Design a protein with these regions (language model features):
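Periplasmic c-type cytochrome electron-transfer domains
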Residues: 1-259
Length: 259
């Protein structure tokens, strides 16, 4: 009992003493109503996109409010989600077509066997978004290397899956159509063929895929949840989550986040 009590005391100390969590981002100044914490119009709009259940809806998994004990927002609800991230061919383990990382169902874990109907297969933990703009790899397999591309995946995973997943069959166009975006993992446009959506998840677990906005399973080539302005504003807001001594991987262009 004494050992458990000592652990609880240490936990309380680490939660309450600011030296263990010296949050110094612009967002922290904003919520603390401190000097330097005034969000620009673009950042404020980005916060609205972040929280909008019909827009970015980022807050559904990356909760931006204080904890139950009043602790500073960690920008994660510590939940697990399956969102069908594309397979990363650059990983040596993926040279084996039979290898699949099922997250909670292994192979690194053994407490959730990958049996049909297991709703945990394909799920990975929602990470904190603090200092997210400083990262150069995203998701469990590091498939994306920019924050903007990651946001665009969320926005068009369902509306333009051909940008993110391989197409089987069909004929490659020598020159893509002018309206074919160049920001995806797949830069070749195909006529015909079948898009292998969720190519890193066995078909028996596709039912575990998250269907919350913006990943709501809307029809292909329909209007995506976020506009270009929404994406730009959201990027501006996410940059406010970097602590003052942390440099962004891709700093916003001068003036991009001011108005």
């Amino acid at each position: 009992r004494a050992f458990a009590a000592a652990g609880q005391a240490l936990q309380a100390f680490q939660l309450e003493d600011v030296s263990f969590h010296p949050y110094s981002s612009k967002f922290d100044l904003y919520i603390g109503n401190k000097i330097g914490g005034v969000l620009t119009p673009a950042e404020a709009r980005g916060l609205k996109v972040f929280a909008d259940p019909n827009g970015g809806n980022c807050a559904s998994c990356h909760y931006q409010g204080a904890g139950l004990n009043g602790s500073t927002a960690l920008f994660t609800d510590f939940s697990y989600e399956a969102i069908g991230v594309p397979r990363n061919a650059a990983l040596p383990v993926n040279a084996d077509p039979g290898y699949v990382d099922l997250g909670l169902c292994g192979p690194a874990r053994t407490d959730h066997p990958p049996t049909p109907g297991n709703r945990f297969c394909g799920m990975f933990k929602s990470p904190t978004l603090r200092n997210v703009a400083s990262r150069r790899s995203f998701f469990h397999n590091g498939i994306f290397h920019s924050l903007e591309q990651t946001i665009r995946f969320y926005n068009t995973r369902d509306t333009m899956p051909e940008l993110w997943y391989p197409t089987v069959g069909g004929q490659a166009k020598a020159t893509p159509d002018p309206d074919f975006p160049g920001y995806g993992l797949i830069t070749t446009q195909y006529v015909g063929g079948q898009v292998r959506k969720f190519d890193d998840l066995p078909a028996r677990f596709v039912g575990n895929i998250d269907t919350q906005m913006p990943l709501d399973g809307r029809p292909a080539h329909s209007k995506p949840p976020m506009s270009e302005q929404d994406i730009a504003d959201l990027l501006c807001f996410l940059n406010t989550l970097n602590d003052k001594d942390v440099q962004p991987a891709e700093p916003p262009k001068p003036g991009a986040c001011t108005s």
